[in-house]
Curated annotation (Swiss-Prot):
GO-annotated biological processes: prolyl-tRNA aminoacylation
Catalysed reactions, semicolon-separated: tRNA(Pro) + L-proline + ATP = L-prolyl-tRNA(Pro) + AMP + diphosphate
Protein name as catalogued: Proline--tRNA ligase
UniProt remark on domains: Consists of three domains: the N-terminal catalytic domain, the editing domain and the C-terminal anticodon-binding domain.
Keyword flag Protein biosynthesis: yes
Summary of subunit composition and partner proteins: Homodimer.
Residues in coiled coil: none
GO cellular component: cytosol
Enzyme's top EC category: ligase
Database matches in SUPFAM superfamilies: Class II aaRS ABD-related (SSF52954), Class II aaRS and biotin synthetases (SSF55681), YbaK/ProRS associated domain (SSF55826)
Disulfide bonds: none
Gene name for this UniProt entry: proS
Lineage: Bacteria, Pseudomonadati, Campylobacterota, Epsilonproteobacteria, Campylobacterales
Pfam families, A to Z: HGTP_anticodon, tRNA-synt_2b, tRNA_edit
General function of this protein: Catalyzes the attachment of proline to tRNA(Pro) in a two-step reaction: proline is first activated by ATP to form Pro-AMP and then transferred to the acceptor end of tRNA(Pro). As ProRS can inadvertently accommodate and process non-cognate amino acids such as alanine and cysteine, to avoid such errors it has two additional distinct editing activities against alanine. One activity is designated as 'pretransfer' editing and involves the tRNA(Pro)-independent hydrolysis of activated Ala-AMP.
Length: 568
């Protein structure tokens, strides 16, 4: 392709709302253009990158034995009502009515659609397993779309769904998809990490996320420095911390005026934060009600809200207001485990089970209890509630845990029978008994990967595409296209590189200065440039490595062999 024939509207102007490098460079480089909040068009270079990523995803999915299909972007609301997600998906699911008043949805995901496709068409265990996938547009009406392609409302996604007759076969496919995804991200040239994850609104039991490692990542990952353990902080675990506090006397109430924070309590009582219990009061949001819930964790720990939300099966947790707390009969700053109002739901962190000698609120203004004994509590619920901290010990190997940032670019789930049961999608087993399909779900954010590549690979000048994702491998830059000899050599090298199977763009723009062409090369991020300029008089051209910006002089007749060597 020739630059003069291609629509590549580069600009020096950075969008006002673009804070991430990928957003800035993809817009400035003419890869994408915003048409609305969280909605982007892909221009020629962006479309090439998108299709390259799509092709790699498709190749590996097909190799794994999955069947490609295509679901309608628009689905009837009745499917979502059948599964029960018409209400639980919330405002992110965009609904509309047609001229006949029929209710429809712009699909944010396709569990319902795939169950509807397979239901009554696969009826026997003999026809299982089955894996269907698509690479198609999705729409989620994000409240705050931002970061360009990273968190848009409309996006391209690969979503796959598998159907099984046994849990064992689901696990086999789940593991196969983990291997397949690793192949995809490796082919794309990305540094990534597979981590344990929370299943979120999709549901199911086991799930893993695939994160592209980048400082700008929205997700905090907990990783071990000694083994392969990794988890999203929402699902991370640590080796339990143990303490041996003495219970010097029976529990007693101590006057602790104006000591509402953990630090104030610890200082007043002359104990460590580890010897205190923190009460976090939340309002749990359910489909048809709200409820005050208290989560108790050690004073030195922090509550992990996703874990807490899962512990009470809520749609969402929000901070309880002062009025909420008073109305529930609680005392802010002095809330404790003992003598709570009987109607209050509370959950205790697992690491506090049967602990003794700790201090907590006395549920009375200006008073705390000391020397408590949690083993005396009856019929209480314990749950892993804490957010793992850097320096905690790995539960797998005893190594140190640390944080890193990641961009979620893939997620795989063991769904079980959640959707098949809800939608009455069954098969006949070996004994002729009807059973719901056991399902898996596997997603990759294809358009998000376009941005993720750049978040991991850029400098202060622009994009640095990996070899697998670059729109063109080589940019031939003719320093002065008005000079006949330079233009001629440019055309010859362009033709030879194409014949050698190297994707190449020829910057033949007559009215663009050399400095402008080089700036575009650095912004657009093609892996290599071949610069034809003054050195041509000596039979030489320059090859520039975009990643390092190193330049080497190469004889004109050796350019092809050198490029072939570099792109291996």
């Amino acid at each position: 392709m020739k630059f003069s024939k291609m629509f590549i509207p580069t600009t020096k102007e950075t969008p006002n709302d673009a804070t991430l490098p990928s957003h800035q460079y993809l817009v400035r480089g003419g890869f994408i253009a915003q048409t609305g909040a969280g909605i982007y068009d892909f221009m020629p270079l962006g479309k090439i990158v998108l299709e390259k990523i799509r092709a790699i995803v498709k190749e590996e999915m097909d190799e794994a034995g999955a069947n490609e299909v295509q679901f309608g972007f628009v689905t009837p609301l009745t499917l979502w009502q059948e599964s029960g997600r018409a209400t639980t998906m919330g405002a992110e699911m965009l609904r509309f009515k047609d001229r006949k008043n029929g209710e429809f949805v712009l699909s944010p995901t396709n569990e319902e659609a795939v169950v509807n496709m397979v239901k009554n068409r696969i009826t026997s265990y003999k026809d299982l397993p089955l894996h269907l996938y698509q690479i198609n547009t999705k729409f989620r009406d994000e409240a705050r779309p931002r970061f360009g392609l990273m968190r848009g409302r409309e996006f391209l996604m690969k979503d796959g769904y598998s159907f099984h007759s046994s849990e064992e076969d689901l696990v086999r496919e789940f593991n196969l998809m983990e291997t397949t995804y690793k192949k995809i991200y490796t082919k794309l040239g990305l540094d990534f990490r597979v981590v344990a994850a929370d299943s979120g609104a999709i549901g199911g039991s086991g799930s893993k996320e695939f994160h592209v490692i980048a400082d700008s990542g929205e997700d905090t990952l907990v990783v071990c420095d000694s083994c392969d353990y990794g988890a999203n902080i929402e699902a991370a675990i640590r080796k339990p911390k143990t303490y041996s506090f003495e219970r010097k006397s029976d529990s007693k109430k101590i006057h602790t005026p104006n000591t509402k924070t953990i630090e104030e309590v610890a200082n007043f009582l002359n104990i460590s934060k580890e010897q205190t219990i923190k009460a976090v009061i939340k309002k749990a949001i359910y489909e048809e009600k709200t409820q005050i819930v208290i989560f108790f964790v050690r004073g030195s720990d922090e509550l992990e809200e996703t874990k807490a939300c899962n512990a009470v099966n809520a749609l969402e947790l929000i901070d309880a207001s002062e009025d909420d707390i008073k109305e529930a009969g609680l005392v802010a700053g002095y809330c404790g485990l003992f003598n709570l109002p009987s109607n209050i739901n509370f959950i205790i962190d697992l690491e506090l089970k049967d602990e003794i000698g700790l201090a907590c609120g006395a549920n009375e203004e200006d008073y705390h209890l000391v020397n408590t004994d949690l083993s005396t509590l009856k019929d209480v619920k314990y749950y892993d509630l804490i957010a793992v901290q850097e320096g905690d010990i790995c539960a797998c190997c005893g190594g140190k845990l640390s944080y890193t940032k990641g961009i979620e670019a893939g997620h795989i789930f063991q769904l079980g029978t959640k959707y098949s049961s809800a939608m009455n999608a069954n098969f006949l087993d070996e004994n002729g008994k009807a059973k719901p399909f056991i399902m898996g779900c596997y997603g990759i954010g294809v358009s998000r990967l376009v941005a993720a590549v750049i978040e991991q690979n850029h400098d202060d000048k622009g994009c640095i595409w990996t070899k697998a994702t670059a729109p063109f491998m080589v940019d031939i830059i003719v320093s002065n296209s008005k000079k006949e000899e330079e233009a001629k050599v440019g055309e010859e090298l362009y033709s030879k590189l194409k014949q050698a199977g190297i994707s190449t763009i020829l910057d033949d723009r007559i009215n663009a200065r050399f400095g402008f062409k080089m700036s575009d090369f650095e912004l657009l991020g093609f892996p290599y440039a071949v610069v034809i300029g003054k050195k041509l008089e000596d039979g030489l051209v320059e090859i520039v490595d975009r990643k390092t910006l190193e330049k080497i002089d190469v004889k004109v007749d050796e350019v092809i062999s050198k490029i072939l060597e570099l792109v291996k």
